[in-house]
Amino acid sequence: MSNQLNTMDIKEILKYLPHRYPFLLIDRVLDFTVGEHLHAIKNVTINEPFFQGHFPIQPVMPGVLILEAMAQATGLLAFKTMSTEPSPEVLYYFAGIDKARFKRVVEPGDQIHFHVKMIKERRGIGVFVGEALVDGELVCSAEIMCARREIKK
C-alpha cells in the first residue's frame, strides 16, 4: 500500500485490477478522491509488445490501448468509489464508450497522464469522463461506462 491515502502504487493497483502483463496499462495513481476523480500514469517504453507491429518504422501506441488504459483508470476509481475492498468475486467491466476523440500520437518515451471524473452511478453502472495527456497536451478524451458484476464460480 502507498504511504499516502490518496495514491496507489503498483502493488495496490494489482489488488484492484485483474489485468496482468502485457495488458496492465496503469503504472501508478498519483491522486484520487473517492466518488470524484482519479489521476493515473502510464510510462510508455519502446519495450511495449505492441510497438513490434504498430508501427516498426514509426512506433505509435494504438488508440484502443489508450482507451483501455483510460478504462483501467476508470475501473480503479469505480472500485474505490463503489466497493470497500477488492474481491475476486467482483469485477468492473468496460460497458461503453462515447465521444472518443484522438488529438495526438503517443510514442516511446512518453508518460501518459489519465484524468478520470465520475459523473454518476446507478445500480452498479458508472458513467465517467476521461482525458489522456502527454506533456500537458490532450491525446484523447472520452466518456466511459463501466458495470459492476459479480463473478459466479
UniProtKB/Swiss-Prot annotation:
<dbReference type="InterPro" id="IPR029069">
    <property type="entry name" value="HotDog_dom_sf"/>
</dbReference>
<keyword id="KW-0963">Cytoplasm</keyword>
<keyword id="KW-0456">Lyase</keyword>
<comment type="similarity">
    <text>Belongs to the thioester dehydratase family. FabZ subfamily.</text>
</comment>
<keyword id="KW-0441">Lipid A biosynthesis</keyword>
<dbReference type="InterPro" id="IPR010084">
    <property type="entry name" value="FabZ"/>
</dbReference>
<dbReference type="InterPro" id="IPR013114">
    <property type="entry name" value="FabA_FabZ"/>
</dbReference>
<feature type="active site">
    <location>
        <position position="54"/>
    </location>
</feature>
<dbReference type="GO" id="GO:0009245">
    <property type="term" value="P:lipid A biosynthetic process"/>
</dbReference>
<keyword id="KW-0443">Lipid metabolism</keyword>
<comment type="function">
    <text>Involved in unsaturated fatty acids biosynthesis. Catalyzes the dehydration of short chain beta-hydroxyacyl-ACPs and long chain saturated and unsaturated beta-hydroxyacyl-ACPs.</text>
</comment>
<dbReference type="Pfam" id="PF07977">
    <property type="entry name" value="FabA"/>
</dbReference>
<protein>
    <recommendedName>
        <fullName>3-hydroxyacyl-[acyl-carrier-protein] dehydratase FabZ</fullName>
        <ecNumber>4.2.1.59</ecNumber>
    </recommendedName>
</protein>
<dbReference type="GO" id="GO:0019171">
    <property type="term" value="F:(3R)-hydroxyacyl-[acyl-carrier-protein] dehydratase activity"/>
</dbReference>
<keyword id="KW-0444">Lipid biosynthesis</keyword>
<dbReference type="GO" id="GO:0006633">
    <property type="term" value="P:fatty acid biosynthetic process"/>
</dbReference>
<dbReference type="GO" id="GO:0005737">
    <property type="term" value="C:cytoplasm"/>
</dbReference>
<dbReference type="GO" id="GO:0016020">
    <property type="term" value="C:membrane"/>
</dbReference>
